[in-house]
Amino acid sequence: MGDVEKGKKIFVQKCAQCHTVEKGGKHKTGPNLHGLFGRKTGQSPGFSYTDANKNKGITWGEETLMEYLENPKKYIPGTKMIFAGIKKKGERADLIAYLKQATNE
């Protein structure tokens, strides 16, 4: 399992410009991520997803996020997420540890 504090720094540096995590947080360029774990792709209420995201049909969890965050466009071809991904597995684990906590508070 990753380091939550390191993951928070990664989120602030690489994700926060497009995503919020708190309950009731607004959508930005990307959707609010509250309640992410256990939710299917393309299901955050009020966000306009691509058909690719809606039709992927996987449920977000540690393993699916680990694969997705390495290369989002490869995992969901047609996603509008323009982020290139995080190549280092340890950094992805840290980010996922943070997301698991922050999106559930």
UniProtKB/Swiss-Prot annotation:
Lyase keyword on record: no
List of residues that carry N6-acetyllysine: 73, 100
Disulfide linkage: none
GO CC list: cytosol; mitochondrial intermembrane space
Keyword Oxidoreductase: no
Modified residues (N6-succinyllysine): 56, 73
Modification after translation (UniProt): Binds 1 heme c group covalently per subunit.
PROSITE patterns linked: CYTC
Main location: mitochondrion
Residues where Phosphotyrosine is found: 49, 98
UniProt keywords, alphabetically: Acetylation, Apoptosis, Electron transport, Heme, Iron, Metal-binding, Mitochondrion, Phosphoprotein, Respiratory chain, Transport
InterPro entries from the UniProt entry: Cyt_c-like_dom, Cyt_c-like_dom_sf, Cyt_c_1A/1B
Family in the record: Belongs to the cytochrome c family.
Described function: Electron carrier protein. The oxidized form of the cytochrome c heme group can accept an electron from the heme group of the cytochrome c1 subunit of cytochrome reductase. Cytochrome c then transfers this electron to the cytochrome oxidase complex, the final protein carrier in the mitochondrial electron-transport chain. Plays a role in apoptosis. Suppression of the anti-apoptotic members or activation of the pro-apoptotic members of the Bcl-2 family leads to altered mitochondrial membrane permeability resulting in release of cytochrome c into the cytosol. Binding of cytochrome c to Apaf-1 triggers the activation of caspase-9, which then accelerates apoptosis by activating other caspases.
Name of the molecule in the record: Cytochrome c
Organism listed in the record: Hippopotamus amphibius
Recorded name of the encoding gene: CYCS
